[in-house]
Amino acid sequence: MGFSEHNLVWLDLEMTGLDPDTDRIIEIATLVTDSQLNILAEGPVLAVRQSEQALAAMDEWNTRTHGESGLIERVRASHLDEAAAEAETLAFLRRWVPERASPMCGNSICQDRRFLYRYMPRLEAWFHYRNLDVSTLKLLANRWHPEVLQGFSKKATHQALEDIRESVAELRHYRAHFLRLPAAGAEGGGAAD
């Protein structure tokens, strides 16, 4: 399967912190699935060059996590600024999904969207205005059926591509164990807007 308006674009960012007014994007990764969550393609995994000042401003958790993963050194070695990483990501996505067709998919994706709006506005605007946020299902499962959470664990490497793969796997888990969808073609199984 190739280019389709039904494909879903999954995205994850690693940042120097959580505040888009003071923190910066240091890694971006994307992948594309079909509507049934089969991975069709993995996009470029890009370390985004940032100043030493931005890296030095990271808190202890970010410094440790991104240092241990090797991301800080990849950021220092990167030749890509935010505009170049945005352009390369858009070039990949345009081969798979028409503009404004896919919701932005991922975990706590609103946070990523805030950073895209600030630092990669063309990429943020390329997505549909809706979000497919796996963390919503996690929160609901925790409140309504906590046993569902026991069947899935994440490595939480805080490496963008691995985090996206885990988000897709997590949504597959919730589809199988929490959403309990009727069989394909069953009454009431149509798509709603």
UniProtKB/Swiss-Prot annotation:
It is found in: Cytoplasm. Keywords: Cytoplasm, Exonuclease, Hydrolase, Nuclease. Residues 8-171 form the Exonuclease domain. Pfam families: RNase_T (PF00929). Its EC number is 3.1.15.-. Disulfide bonds: none annotated. It comes from the Bacteria. The keyword Transmembrane helix does not apply. The active site is at Y129. GO terms for biological process: DNA metabolic process. InterPro entries: Exonuclease_RNaseT/DNA_pol3 (IPR013520), Oligoribonuclease (IPR022894), RNaseH-like_sf (IPR012337), RNaseH_sf (IPR036397). Transmembrane segments: none annotated. One of its GO terms (cellular component) is cytoplasm. 3'-to-5' exoribonuclease specific for small oligoribonucleotides. NCBIfam families: PRK05359.1. Belongs to the oligoribonuclease family. This is Oligoribonuclease.
